[in-house]
């Protein structure tokens, strides 16, 4: 396993409170390592080969600090729709081309400039607490979807001549 640090991982907290205890992460483009926050580590050589994504079922209720080594990934989809996800932090993901993040709480700022400089497509929706988003230096952006972020008051979009689609609504 690579050493998982704040600089090279995606970090967030999973809050298992009800009967639904399963977390699904869809990824593609390279190897990944997941620390599920309960002492279990999982290495995935080819996450795209796993139909429905990488799935983990928590046995007990509680809060778990999840870390995902994502330096090689080109796509990741993390959603808190079915299980509560909060406090998201992004590490260095230089190969990331498609980033999908939905239904996440307790995250006030996302700065993709440093961590996802080569991202081409972003889908950021239903962040209950997101106030500020920065993507002005993500020069390869082609598809931008930002929606249903009720506290979003500041976005640094910059100039993106290659953008083919921009959807920004209910923010």
What kind of feature is each model-predicted range?
Residues 88, 133, 155:
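Acidic/charged coordination and interface sites in well-structured regions
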